[in-house]
Amino acid sequence: YAPNVYMNDPLRRYVVFGCLFEGDRLESKRPRGWAGMQSIPRVVFLQENELLIQPAHECYMLRKECLGAYAKQEKMDAKGQQIEIELSYRPSEKSVLQIVLQASPDGEERTVFTLDYGKNDLFLDRSHSTVYSDITKEDIHAPIVYEERSVQLRIFVDHSSIEIFYDDRLTMSARIFPGREDSVENSVKVSDDVSMLVGRIYRLACETEI
């Protein structure tokens, strides 16, 4: 919604700041006195007549320590509310990747992002993202097409926001509002037919560390 686009930096990039709305009921917004937030900076560019989008290079500066790394046949997990998940992998035609975000230990709260190449579908399931009843929990879908090559995936989580960048071709953004203080668990699981090249979870800097 109403993105702000700038092209005035020395690299002559088109830098976009999107607007992320929470989508909950109006009466629940009034006590807060605010609504919506801006996305991380994104760069849009043309490559072989295709419009691509990726996080601005400066977002790498937010990375602090690595909280988890993927090992073959194991689940990658880490705790945190400000994280970046970086994956580079080679899928097959039926591969499935499941990424659980901001989950409580008992699973009462959880947001689940699934990449299902057999169904050509990206799916963000927010149905259990919060225990609150006045928050939008609609599912978000986007189509994908299997290609026999490696894929890059980056996911940014910042407390109530999730921003997903799929292979520089597609973005998916959403708001979530976990109500439990222990909803800080994040994990990545992949089917056996996925060849994982890179898998890491980073803690992102808070405002006092920038």
Task: Please annotate each region the language model reported.
Residues 1-210:
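Beta-rich accessory regions
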